[in-house]
Structures are given as structure tokens and as C-alpha cells.
Curated annotation (Swiss-Prot):
Main location as per UniProt: cytoplasm
UniProt binding sites for ATP: 263
Species in which this protein is naturally found: Porphyromonas gingivalis (strain ATCC BAA-308 / W83)
Taxonomic lineage: Bacteria, Pseudomonadati, Bacteroidota, Bacteroidia, Bacteroidales
EC top class named in words: ligase
Cellular localization per UniProt: Cytoplasm
Locus of motif 'HIGH' region: 12-22
InterPro entries with a match to the protein in the record: aa-tRNA-synth_I_cd-bd (IPR045462), aa-tRNA-synth_I_codon-bd_sub2 (IPR020751), aa-tRNA-synth_I_CS (IPR001412), aa_tRNA-synth_I_cd-bd_sf (IPR008925), Glu-tRNA-ligase_bac/mito (IPR004527), Glu/Gln-tRNA-synth (IPR000924), Glu/Gln-tRNA-synth_Ib_cat-dom (IPR020058), GluQ/Sye (IPR049940)
EC number(s) recorded for this UniProt protein: 6.1.1.17
A GO biological-process term: glutamyl-tRNA aminoacylation
Protein name as annotated: Glutamate--tRNA ligase
Pfam families: Anticodon_2, tRNA-synt_1c
Function: Catalyzes the attachment of glutamate to tRNA(Glu) in a two-step reaction: glutamate is first activated by ATP to form Glu-AMP and then transferred to the acceptor end of tRNA(Glu).
Keyword set, alphabetical order: Aminoacyl-tRNA synthetase, ATP-binding, Cytoplasm, Ligase, Nucleotide-binding, Protein biosynthesis
Gene name of the encoded protein: gltX
Amino acid sequence: MINRRIRVRFAPSPTGPLHIGGVRTALYNYLFARQHGGDMILRIEDTDSNRFVPGAEAYIIEALEWLGIKFDEGVGYGGRFGPYRQSERRDIYRTYVRQLLDSGRAYIAFDTPEELEARRAEVPNFQYDATTRGQMRNSLTLPAEEVERLVAEGTQYVVRFLVEPNLDVEVNDLIRGRVVINSSILDDKVLYKSADDLPTYHLANIVDDHLMEVSHVIRGEEWLPSAPLHVLLYRAFGWEDTMPRFAHLALLLKPEGNGKLSKRDGDRLGFPVFPLEWKDPQTGDISKGYRESGYLPEAVVNFLALLGWNPGNDQDVMSMDELIRLFDIEKCSKAGAKFDYEKGRWFNHQYIQRKDNAELAELFRPILRENGVVATDEKTAHVISLVKERVNFIGELWEQAGFFFIAPLSYDEKTVKKRWKEDTAKQLGELAELLDSHRSFAAEATEPTVKNWIETNGYHLGNIMNATRLALVGESKGPHIFDIMEVLGREETVGRIRRAIEVLG
């Protein structure tokens, strides 16, 4: 392995929204690149035109930007190895298809889909390989003149890689160690289709990684069975000395651990599997995302980083900078990681507690607007400081703090029965008079005054406080009652108490 600059790529296909497993792959690439002072490339692998979904590429870019996963070059970023969309690299791929054909490492096949289907029906476990290619319609069995004629006439064909049998192909994986597979189990994979003049994933992947000087390929374990083919392609091109190192990440599993995590699991258990909300352009169906569900991007990043890797200590909460410093690709687990969505909620709660109140106020502002509330930044930040320990998601801020901005229109019946006693109206009337004449409304000023008044009059502290909370909030929730009064101010506090007396009697 020659010593060279670390360069990694995240290469999604625009076939739909980016799955949370793909986000983790992008994150691990990013952590590895940043740790080694290397480059992160965004490449869009859009060679499968049949599966292309409008809007998917823009979604992928927006999702990664939201999560703070940044690229040095690629689609939307530019760079000297472009273009970075595979559909824009046709001329490049044609050159390398021709190189393989000329060197005898690939061949042209004219078998139609119907003919191949017939063979599969005749022969169980049929595959196009060294044992069967001599029986098929291809440039290995047809005269050269006929091959030229068929191509000239526009007959559709594919180019297949000629896999030599009985070779031990070694893949040195950074996570799984040495993996050896005999080439006899591999089929002659299709590398190019004349129908759309585009390569398949395998050829485009190898050519692009080589030309873009990718040093490490970090991807999901679903690509591990393809790794021997990719090694053989590097050999066929004479690029084995500059072949990247591979690291195949274990799958994200269902919370129960039995199988790969899917959208269906999220729907069943009530958690997102996409970073952002996604609207299917064909059906109009909407799938919720982590952003719209009230998750902070830092929490999602921290949560995902620890699904399949840990720093070797008891530390859970880590910033992106800490993750970059501690991440070790070789310590990633070979076994799949159960998706613990409750742990994700826990991480979000931790990050909400740590986040600056002014920043949370910015995130809360759209929710205030939806509820017709206009409030100062100072008040909003103050309110958040009082309630954020009670919330797991941004959306829950309104549930916990809405009463600070809109007076209760009704009162919880159970709380009324429990807290509103015969003498409550009289006592709260006196409290309203006391508060209305109080000069300072800071909590540290009102609390001793009110408690002294309660003691002097022989009233029950708990009864007064509970009834006052009901008057101000409409139910029995909320932070310290004197903090609530301070935020509401004298006029609003007294007004709410007097309205409760009027309504509840």
C-alpha cells in the first residue's frame, strides 16, 4: 500500500430518501476523512435510470448539510475530478469499457432477457460464468464478423466481465480482516448496457474511485459480496497497486435485532428512519424525518456514531470534534447494531439541555408563529430555560411552555376538583391584591413576600400554590410557580388569577 493522501467518498444513488443507515455511512466517512486531514467527496451514482426519483439528489444534499456532514468536493461543491454525477461521465466509461474489451477481460453478450429467463427456468441456480458462457450468444461464441454486424445494426447488448475461475481473491477489510473468496462462485457481471449507454454500478464505481484517487472505500456490508469482483476489476485495469482499502460496515438492525432496519419498522414503532421529511413524488405519501420530529442534528450524529462503534470508554455524549478525534474505523463492530430508538430520544434530551437557550429560541420561533404568538427573543429564551429539562423534542416546548404566551381558556377538571377548595376564591382574591401592589416581580422578591403573607394569615402553603398554578397554567404542570409569575409579569399574573376566580368561583 503506497502512502498517499486520505480521500473518501460518499456515493448515494438518487432512488429515494436517504435512509438513516446511509447517513451513518456518510458520517463514518466524514469522521475518518477529518481525523486524517483528508478529503470528503460527494458522488451521485445515478446510472440506474429506471430507479431515478426526482428530488432525491437535492434531498440527500440538504439532509447531509443539516447534519453538519461537509464535503470538500463533489456534486454542488465542484472539484478537479468532476463531473461528479455518473450520468455525466459516459464518455469516460466508454473508454474503459473498450479497454477491457481490447484486453480480452470483457466480452459482448447479445442474450435477450427472455433467453436468459428461459435458461434460468431450465437450469436451477443458473449463472453466466466460465461453465455456461460458451453456450450463450456472445462475442466468445459468435464469429467476429457477426458481432460487428449485430453491433452496427443497433442490436442491444451488454458487456460482461470475464471472470477467470479458480482464483483465490483476497480482500483485506479494515473491519473484518482478511476475506478470501474463490472466483468460481462469481458470475460474469454486466458492466455496461448499450440500451442506455451507461455502465452498471460495478464498472462506474471502480473507474470513478480510481480516477478520483479514493484511498478508502467505507460502505455497508451489503457490498461485501461484490468486493472480490471489484478486486478483480482493479487487477484487470492494472490498478491493483493503487486499489483503495475497504471497510464494510455492519448493518443497522431492527430494534428486536432480527433483520435489517426498514421504514416499516419506523412506521410500526413510531420513529423516523429518514433524516428529513420525505414526500413521495408518485404517491404523495409523507414520511416523517428526524428534523421535523424535533431532533437536533448534533444528537442524531452522536446517536448514529455509537451504533456500531464506541470509543472504548463510558462516554456517551460527544461533539463532532470529539467524535473526529476518537473515531477508529478498525474498532467498528462486525456484528449488526440494534437500532435503539429510545436511546435516540435520550441523546436528544441531553443535547437540548446543553444547547444555548437563544439557539433553542430560534428553533422554537416557527412553532410560536404557528400558534399566533409574537414574543421577544429575551422572553422566549427565558421561558425555554425554565422548561427545557422537561422535553425530549423541540415540539414538546409548546406543550410545556404554551401557557407562558397564551392564557388558559379552560381549566383541567380533575385538577379543579382536587385543588379548588371552598375558601380558594377568597384567598386568591387576597393574593391578587397583594401581587398587584408589589413593586418588584422578580421571583426572588415575590416568593418571600407571598410565603410570609401565607404564614401570617395561617393559610395552607400547598393549597395556595396549587390553586395559583391552576389559575396561571390551567393545569398542575409547569416550572417553579414564582418563575412563572416573573415571566408573566404583574399585570398578566393578577389578571389570570382574577379570571380563574370569576370562572371557578
